[in-house]
Amino acid sequence: MKTEGLHHVTAFARDPQENLRFYTEVLGLRLVKKTVNFDDPGTYHFYFGNQNGDPGTIMTFFPFQGSGQGTVGKGQAGRVYFSVPSGSLSFWKERLEKSGLSLEEKTLFGEKGLIFDDTEDLPLAIMEDAKSGKSEWTPDGITTNEAITGMKGVLLYSYDPQATIQLLTESFGYTKVAEEDQIVRLASSAAVGGVIDVHLHPEKRGVGGYGTVHHVAFRTKKKEQAKWLPIIAENHLPSSEILDREYFTSVYFREKGGILFEIATDEPGFMTDETFAELGTSLKLPEWLEKHRQQITDILPEL
C-alpha cells in the first residue's frame, strides 16, 4: 500500500478569533469548514485550505480558550511546512514581518524557506516549491504568484525515530531521499503534502496544549481505507474503527514513536453540506448534533 501523502494536520489553538484572523488574513488560507470537535462539541473545529479544501492543503484547529500552552517535542509532529511558488519568499518575509512575527531564513534540503511560529507559538515554515502549482484562492494583497498552495509536509519528533521511519517506508510507501542536520527526509509521489521529515535526535518530551500538533492525517481513497486496517495491525499498532467525520472517514492509531496518525479518505469532501461559494460561512453540525444546536452555540465563543 502507498499513501498519497498528507490529507491534513490538526493542531491545538487557544483563541478562536485570533486563529481565524491569522490563518485567513495573514496566511491567506480559505476557511472551508466551521464545525465543532465531534468528541467535544463545545469546542470549534476550523478547517483551512485552498479554494476547494482539497486533501493535502488542509490545516485544522481545535481552538479551546481554557487550554494551557503545550511543549513541542517527542511524541508529536513539530513544524508544519506550507508550500508557496518559487520567487515569493521576499513577499512573505515582508508580509509576516509586518504582522510582527520573528523569522529565520533557512535552506532545508536545498529549498529556501522562512521559519517562524504563529501567534500562538505553533511552529510553521513557508517553503518555496516549484512542483506544487498555484492556488486560485487569492484574498486581498495576495496573488497567484504568492498564495500558499498547500502543505509541503511536517517534521516529526518521535520517541523511536527508526521505528517511525521504518513504518513510513515499509508500510506507507515513502522513500528516504536525503539526510542533513540530524533530519531524515522521506517523500511520496504527491505534489502537495508529499514530505515527511523525521528528526533523529529530538530532545524534549512533547506535552499537548495550544501551539502543538494533535495528529497527522494521511490520504487514502474511500474504497482503499479498510485495507489499511490489517497493515496497521501487522505493525502491532492498536487502531480505532473506521469513524465517520462527515467530510471524510478516519482510522486513528498511535505509531511506535508516540505520534498520533490518521488515515483519512479523500471522499466525500467539504461540499456535502455547503456549496463552493458557501464554504466556511456558517456553523455546520452533523445530523446527530443538530438537535443540540442551541445548547452548542450557547457554549461556543462568539466570533
Curated annotation (Swiss-Prot):
Induction: Repressed by MhqR. Strongly induced by stress due to exposure to 2-methylhydroquinone (2-MHQ) and less strongly induced after diamide or catechol stress. Not induced by oxidative stress due to hydrogen peroxide or methylglyoxal. GO terms for molecular function: dioxygenase activity; metal ion binding. InterPro entries: cNMP-bd_dom, Extradiol_RC_dioxygenase, Glyas_Bleomycin-R_OHBP_Dase, Glyas_Fos-R_dOase_dom, VOC. Its EC number is 1.13.11.-. Binds 1 Fe(2+) ion. CDD domains: PcpA_C_like, PcpA_N_like. Fe cation binds at H8, H215, E262. It is found in: Cytoplasm. The keyword rRNA-binding does not apply. Its main location: cytoplasm. Keywords: Aromatic hydrocarbons catabolism, Cytoplasm, Detoxification, Dioxygenase, Iron, Metal-binding, Oxidoreductase, Repeat. Residues 5-129, 150-266 form the VOC domain. Its cofactor is Fe(2+). One of its GO terms (cellular component) is cytoplasm. One of its GO terms (biological process) is catabolic process. Disruption phenotype: No visible phenotype. Growth is not inhibited by 2-methylhydroquinone or catechol. Belongs to the extradiol ring-cleavage dioxygenase family. Putative ring-cleavage dioxygenase that may contribute to the degradation of aromatic compounds. This is Putative ring-cleaving dioxygenase MhqE. It comes from Bacillus subtilis (strain 168). The lineage of its organism: Bacteria, Bacillati, Bacillota, Bacilli, Bacillales. The gene is mhqE.
